[in-house]
Regions:
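Short beta-strand-to-loop acidic/aromatic patch adjacent to the donor-nucleotide binding site
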Residues: 68-81
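Short coil/turn segments at beta-strand junctions that form active-site/ligand-binding loops
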Residues: 6, 67-70, 95
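Catalytic-site signature of metal-activated, phosphate-bearing donor transferases
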Residues: 48-59, 79-226
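Active-site-proximal specificity loops/subdomain of glycosyltransferases
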Residues: 18-70
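Short beta-strand/loop segment that forms part of the nucleotide-sugar
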Residues: 6-17, 38
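Gly/Ala-rich phosphate-binding loop of Rossmann-like dinucleotide-binding domains
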Residues: 2
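Residues that form or flank phosphate/diphosphate-binding pockets in enzymes
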Residues: 17-18, 80
């Protein structure tokens, strides 16, 4: 995300995989980023109290960001092309516009790249919880999905617009709580390229689908602790 994003807050909770140490070291090196430790475990299913709800954790972290500032919400299992991300900050023309980012869920198995078969044959077009917005909105609310409790942001009186191109790689299995999951409905990279040939060069730069580059991005995660 550097140097596109030069300041912000990094929320974390209940880390036992070395993430806390990485975050603290990063914030020490780049003091314009503030580490925010949430004092409760976040539980997606059968939460004992609201303090353990994911949306409450999001609101706690968001509370450290000043109102009336532009905010982008990102997750730890995304790796960004900084130039593309920076360009996307110029998409909104008013504080009433919200940029919805697209993504592909990449899965690496035995050094081979696949896409999870989500959305339109692996392409999630301006979908999900990945936004650029002006922070004059209401707090996060709970969102129930498949029995789990997540977060949603009610962006009232806002106009949603799509990103212009894919700006990041999303590796959902890089999160520790997901690394035991097995996905059977996977799309080989070559099949994705063939199916979405119309998107390559328009919504997706070809280099974003280069297998060697994707594997290099994936190897940036410290998976040895897993």
């Amino acid at each position: 995300m550097l140097p596109a994003i030069q300041r912000g807050v990094i929320g974390f909770n209940d880390c036992d995989d070395g993430s806390k140490e990485v975050i603290l070291e990063f914030c020490k090196k780049f003091p314009s980023f503030i580490p925010i430790s949430y004092p409760y475990e976040v539980i997606l299913k059968d939460c004992p109290s609201l303090w353990h709800q994911f949306y409450h954790y999001c609101n706690y972290t968001l509370s450290f960001i000043p109102k009336n500032e532009w905010v982008i919400k990102i997750d730890c299992d995304h790796i960004y092309d900084a130039k593309k991300l920076y360009k996307s900050f110029y998409i909104p023309k008013s504080i009433k516009e919200v940029v919805m980012y697209s993504r592909i869920n990449f899965v690496v198995q035995d050094f081979e790249v696949f896409m999870r078969n989500d959305g339109d044959f692996g392409f999630l077009d301006a979908w999900g919880d990945h936004w650029l917005f002006y922070n004059d909105c209401e707090p996060f609310e709970i969102w129930q999905y498949n029995g789990d409790a997540y977060e949603t942001l009610k962006l009232k009186d806002k106009h949603y617009i799509k990103d212009k191109e894919l700006v990041q790689w999303h590796f959902p299995l890089a999160k520790k709580r997901r690394n035991a999951l097995v996905y059977n409905d996977l799309i080989p990279l070559k099949d994705f390229k063939k199916h979405h040939a119309d998107l390559i060069g328009t919504r997706i730069e070809e280099s974003m689908l280069d297998e060697k580059r994707i594997l290099e991005m994936y190897q940036k995660f410290n998976l040895a602790e897993r």
